[in-house]
């Protein structure tokens, strides 16, 4: 019952100022808060939301644009003065040809693969610790690079979530029919239907709710 007032307040405020809804990361914290209202399957709900966020973020990196993100994020990092040779290697022919190099393309492909695969790895018992280590690795990489427009507390939260939800606990797949219909409905809508509509009609669905953080309508 304690989680319902914040959810109700968010639902009331959001239509009047949608910035509140996006700044609150309702597509992540809001879904998780709702899952906590169900004592019998809260852990499953939190795990599914986290897997959905990772998978959506990974899929949104697919395409030719993400390699430019890797180059610019690395070059604008506070750590940039410590790795000049690496930064030059990210360009095809620094300083005359600033296009992403093969190294940059490989790094972007690895980042895309890592974030897309970390959810399934965490959900599968024998590989869950590998998934946790992978999650800690790429969230730490993003955090220490301090990229523009990136919410760093989200990376810290995801690292904590990886350890607690999949390191401390195994994937809590409930028996068939054990998930409350309300929770199942919200998870289906929030993690499948809304992102699918957002992929088909990106101008109509906010990029966070469509799980398009790297391909969104900012």
Identify the meaning behind each predicted range:
Residues 1-218:
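Alpha-helical membrane-anchoring segments
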